[in-house]
């Protein structure tokens, strides 16, 4: 059997829901399941940069790409600054190809702020938690959005919404993930749906 989600296996009559204790060890160390094993025994992830053929009961897995790192220590710092900026801009532009408005997620962090500024987006989307300023970045996101300037859409997640949707979020993730940003990502995606086109093409 193969699928894009583990949950696609669970209804199969021959599938056994058995805990993979080795994945549990990795989870307790890294807060997620690293590597190619999963929390389910005998269920594996397809490794990055791999594909497989399945024929006559046999699976043949092949690697199609290996990253190469060639050190060029003789280049000055200014060269690498320009290279990083060019690579970043190329990536942003590749993700902006659309015939509709483009938006981006925005927190108070440097990475999402840089993307929002460089991509010349039309909208930004932010969520925060309803427990004071410590875990709520909405005010900073709105401030940056005004400077760009673009319209910022935001949502404050209440404790009731957090715990009320936690089971659903875990269901979609297939495996335990001890990173609360998964909850924020779920809600910011739902916030996007309220202010963007429902068309599958968009």
Model-based region annotation:
Residues 192:
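Hydrophobic pocket-lining residues that define ligand/cofactor binding sites across diverse proteins
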Residues 1-174, 185, 189:
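Cysteine-centered catalytic environments shared across enzyme families
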Residues 179:
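Substrate-binding/specificity loop regions of serine endopeptidase catalytic domains
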């Amino acid at each position: 059997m193969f699928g894009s989600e583990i949950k696609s296996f669970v209804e199969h009559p021959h599938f056994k829901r058995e805990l993979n204790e080795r994945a549990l060890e990795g989870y307790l160390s890294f807060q997620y399941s690293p590597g190619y094993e999963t929390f389910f025994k005998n269920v594996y992830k397809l490794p990055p940069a791999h594909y497989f053929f399945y024929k006559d009961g046999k699976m043949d897995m092949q690697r199609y790409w290996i990253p190469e790192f060639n050190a060029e220590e003789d280049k000055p710092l200014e060269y690498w600054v320009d290279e990083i900026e060019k690579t970043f801009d190329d990536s942003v532009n590749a993700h902006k190809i659309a015939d509709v408005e483009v938006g981006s997620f925005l927190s108070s962090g440097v990475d999402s702020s840089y993307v929002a500024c460089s991509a010349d987006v039309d909208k930004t989307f932010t969520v925060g938690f309803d427990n004071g300023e410590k875990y709520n970045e909405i005010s900073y996101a709105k401030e940056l959005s005004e400077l760009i300037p673009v319209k910022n859409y935001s949502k404050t997640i209440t404790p009731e919404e957090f715990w009320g949707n936690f089971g659903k979020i875990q269901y979609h993730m297939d495996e335990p993930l001890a990173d609360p940003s998964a909850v924020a990502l779920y809600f910011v995606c739902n916030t996007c749906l309220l202010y963007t086109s429902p068309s599958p093409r968009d």
